[in-house]
């Protein structure tokens, strides 16, 4: 990781069927994560509720993260019914403040 500040776009939402969402949604990468500045991502599932997922996408800059968040919102409005979403996912922007690996 460089010393430059990085931005993280964190998305949380419930999915009706994780495997279907992962295969037909996330893995297909319809927006093009790399082409829009995503440097890395993590997909997380809740231990208490496996249908709850969180995705963390890391960017070099806040403007890149904001632009990608808007593309996600546009896509969600189009595909929400297919994945059984009762409400659209929520996207929040964060600045990476500290990282330590052990």
What do the PLM-derived regions correspond to, one by one?
Residues 1-5, 36-54, 77-102:
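Glycine-rich beta-strand-turn "strand-cap" elements at beta-sheet edges
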